[in-house]
Curated annotation (Swiss-Prot):
Its EC number is 2.1.1.8. CDD domains: AdoMet_MTases (cd02440). The gene is hnmt. Inactivates histamine by N-methylation. Plays an important role in degrading histamine and in regulating the airway response to histamine. The keyword Manganese does not apply. Gene3D superfamilies: Vaccinia Virus protein VP39. It is found in: Cytoplasm. Substrate binds at E28, N283. It is an enzyme of class 2 (transferase). This is Histamine N-methyltransferase. Its main location: cytoplasm.
Length: 293
């Protein structure tokens, strides 16, 4: 890794801006929405059986857009049952956005929300120190396992937090996505550190199998328009490139040979296709649903 490269996560405002651009340019949330509309209701049909309150834990929930969609489906599947929703999210900006979203949302009268500004590791440490293990009927970790130091330990801990019939839902980039190729080839040259791990759903499936965990996997086709990355001086393109490489100001700070190689690889068939003159990146996701033992 070149010591002049800094993780995008070291500049929180830039990370949030690049993430918002990523969502605008990709079908990330749309493909999750399709999954929530079609497959998700069946997945949560058995959670919280015979309980008066369904306990939910969101890890790295961001601004809550996907959370509220899932809560809506859980409400439909379990009418009249109260929901306690605990949110663990390290970003103050995202928590503010989540609270604003809740304030505008209808039909949440039976749902209580509690926000905890902390990382998943901090939450785990707090639970262990207080020795007050709380069990949850549904735990979700969407696009966040890149940001933990010890993935297998994190999986084991949150799996242990599941109540009877509980489900742990994980969403990550697919092992057949453009991300996988990009990370495997260039990860050693990018600012891989305590802030970010280059891990795919394929890696998670292997870890869960080695634990003897029961789980199911679902593939979510998704793409992202990265055409602007190839336009010189285009700020949106530069921000998207930051997000793709998890590097702060990659275009300006990366060595010329690395920059050219990554731009070349982003256009390769392993990463992208060309459609109507646009470069469309393979952003495929995988959903993994883990069951309690």
């Amino acid at each position: 890794m070149d010591s002049g490269l800094r993780s995008l996560l070291s500049d929180h405002s830039r990370y949030v801006e690049s993430f918002r651009l990523f969502l605008l340019n990709s079908t990330e949330h749309q493909c999750m929405q399709r999954f929530i509309d079609t497959q998700f209701p069946h997945i949560v049909s058995s959670i919280g059986k015979d309980k008066s309150v369904i306990d939910i834990l969101g890890i790295g929930s961001g601004s809550g857009e996907i959370d509220l969609q899932m809560i809506g489906k859980i409400q439909s599947r379990h009418p009249g049952v109260a929901i306690s929703n605990q949110i663990v999210e390290p970003s103050a900006e995202q928590i503010i956005g989540y609270k604003e979203r809740v304030a505008k949302a209808p039909n949440l009268g039976a749902v209580s929300f509690s926000w905890h500004r902390q990382t998943s590791s901090e939450y785990e440490r707090q639970v262990n120190e207080e020795k007050q293990m709380r069990s949850y009927d549904f735990i979700h970790m969407i696009q966040m396992l890149y940001y933990v130091k010890d993935v297998p330990a994190t999986l084991r801990f949150f799996k242990s937090c599941l109540a009877p019939n509980g489900k742990l839902l994980i969403i990550l980039v697919s092992g057949n996505s453009g991300w996988s190729m990009l990370w495997k080839k260039h990860g050693p040259q990018l600012p891989l550190n305590d802030l970010c791990l280059y891990v795919t759903a394929g890696d998670i499936a292997q870890m869960l199998s080695s634990m003897g965990a029961r789980f199911q996997s679902y593939e979510l086709p998704s793409d992202m328009d990265i055409t602007e990355c190839f336009i010189e001086g285009d700020r949106n393109g530069e921000m998207l490139l930051d997000f793709l490489t998890e590097t702060c100001d990659f275009k300006r700070n990366a060595p010329a040979d690395l920059r050219e190689q990554i731009l070349c690889d982003l256009k390769s068939p392993e990463c992208s296709t060309t459609r109507d003159g646009k470069v469309i990146f393979n952003n495929n996701l995988s959903v993994i649903v883990v069951e309690r033992d």
